[in-house]
Amino acid sequence: MADKDQGPATEWQSAQAAAIGHGAVAAINGGFFTPEGKPLGLVIEEGKRIGTWNSQSSLTSGLLSVEKSPRLLRRQHWRSFSPTRHLLQAGPFLIENSAVVRDLSDRERRPRSFLVWNGRHRWAFGIAEGVTLASLSAALAAQPLSEITITTALNLDGGRSSDLWASPRIPGGPVSTRRIWNTPVRNYLLLLPSR
């Protein structure tokens, strides 16, 4: 997790800049933020709380929580007293228990950023162009990744915020999805190399 204390227009202007600035091999835009540049929900970076807990919006219905190991869970299952190193509220869920999430919007085709997990130790993040939440959920439920069986998928901020970068150290890299029309974002999820 890399959050910009001073808001979206400061520090790293792209996923690539955020990744390089933190020694990461890949990065993707993170959670939603308000027009004033504040996180829409709670963000925790290295134990520091940023923003406030949001229990209302579907855009914060799930979270990535990193305690001893990372996991995706619904906001009602996280406890504020947990020793959380990193946390990002985002949403909605696209896949839960290896199944499509019902009642997702089938309107607004746009770029979507997402995070997937196999429920154990395998993770991936990606961007899909011109899809609805419902169509992305269906596509992910079809298990398109040969190296990971997706049990859980979480929608991240998308649209003009969608920005993924992978270095040449990643198989298939380098990759950058940044477009001229991208807007600065509040935070990024980072993939750090194994130590």
Question: Residue spans of the language-model regions?
Answer:
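Gly/Ser/Thr/Pro-rich low-complexity, intrinsically disordered segments
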Residues: 1-195
